[in-house]
Structures are given as C-alpha cells and as structure tokens.
Regions:
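Long, low-complexity
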Residues: 1-70
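Proline-rich intrinsically disordered, low-complexity coils
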Residues: 39-41, 54, 97, 117, ...
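C-terminal assembly and membrane-engagement modules of membrane-active proteins
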Residues: 64, 68-71, 75-78, 82, ...
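Intrinsic-disorder-associated interaction segments
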Residues: 14-24, 75-82, 95-98, 116, ...
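Aromatic-enriched hydrophobic runs in primary sequence
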Residues: 9-12, 86, 142, 152
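Polyanion-binding surfaces on beta-sheet-dominated domains and ring/shell assemblies
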Residues: 104-141, 158
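Membrane-inserting effector segments that mediate pore formation, membrane fusion
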Residues: 48-114, 126-127
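Long, hydrophobic, amphipathic alpha-helical segments used as structural scaffolds
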Residues: 36-39, 90-97, 138, 142
C-alpha cells in the first residue's frame, strides 16, 4: 500500500543552525497537518502535540540544499488533493509579488488570499475558509491562533523558495518486510 508523501526542497540555503533547521521541520509538519485537516475542516486544526496527525519525517542535506520528506498517516485521495492544494498555494504565493509598502500579518494574508485557488472543489473551498478564518482571527487581534501561525508558515516556505511536491511512496513497513534480514 502506498502512503501520501509531501517532499519539500529548500535550495540556496547557507549553513543553517539547529534553530533554523527546527523551524523548517516545524514548517513541513504544519503543511502535513493542513493536508490532513483540509478534507474535514469542521474538525479542529492541530499542528503539534496531542491530537496532531502522525507523520514520519526524513531529512536529507546535500550541497546547498535541504530536502524533507513527510509521509502522512493517511492514504485517501482527499488528503492527497488537500496536500496538492497546499503545495499549489505555496507555489502561487512564491510567484506573487510582495508590495513594498505592505507589511504585517494583514498584508501577508492578502498575499495568500490573492494566490489562493478560486475553484469550486471541496478542498479549494476549505483553503479559502482557512484563510478567511485566519483573517478573522487577525481582525479580532488574535494573532497567535493556529490558523494564523499556519498561514504565516506557508508564507515563510514560499519566501524561502521551497518547492513542495506531493507524491505516493511505498509504505515503509512493507518495504522493510520485503528485504531479507541481515545478521550484524
């Protein structure tokens, strides 16, 4: 059976410290949490801790870049479409020019809103509702909610030039079982 995986490639990274590496891993975990949550937006969005969707994360650093692969604990097509919508949003925001005079969380949410998909699918509507919820939180002066932090994470990934890809990979336990055991 195949798992849904989100591959995030960051290029042109200078040597990064542990804190920056932890931030990148947190960003990728947020993308995974959004992908797991978008098919059921009536549920509570949980990014970390108890109640968060379990994931498996692999990190590879090569040359000037870092690649992270996060495998979701979901195999359904809805989660795959949600992950693709998030990847598309990050790519679109990266292409969206940043206004010189616009600063702050509201301006960031405006960038996300302009780049958000305008389709009629359930996932695209859920993305727009997520962004509208983040905007509502900001207007109510609640800037530390999960929605606002998740939206800012998507912007950070886009600003860092992250390439987000969604793919299917072989289930890790199944792959391990297929290999013969080797004595050590």
């Amino acid at each position: 059976m195949q798992e849904i995986a989100i591959r995030v490639r960051l290029t042109e990274q200078e040597r990064i410290g542990l804190a920056e590496h932890e931030r990148v891993i947190g960003s990728v975990a947020t993308v995974a949490a959004l992908a797991a949550w978008l098919p059921d937006p009536a549920a509570r969005l949980v990014v970390r801790g108890r109640g968060a969707a379990p994931v498996r994360l692999e990190t590879v650093s090569h040359g000037p870049g870092t690649e992270l692969l996060v495998a979701l604990d979901r195999r359904d097509a809805a989660a795959e479409r949600a992950a693709a919508a998030v990847a598309s949003l990050v790519a679109a925001v990266a292409q969206e020019p940043r206004a010189e005079d616009a600063t702050g969380i509201t301006a960031d949410l405006d960038r996300l809103d302009r780049a958000a998909p305008r389709g009629r699918s359930a996932v695209e509507r859920a993305v727009r509702e997520f962004l509208e919820g983040a905007r509502t939180d900001v207007l109510a002066r609640r800037t530390t909610t999960t929605r606002v932090r998740a939206a800012q994470t998507l912007l950070r990934l886009a600003d860092d030039g992250a390439e987000v890809l969604v793919e299917r990979i072989e289930d890790a336990p199944a792959a391990d079982a297929a290999e013969p055991t080797r004595p050590y």
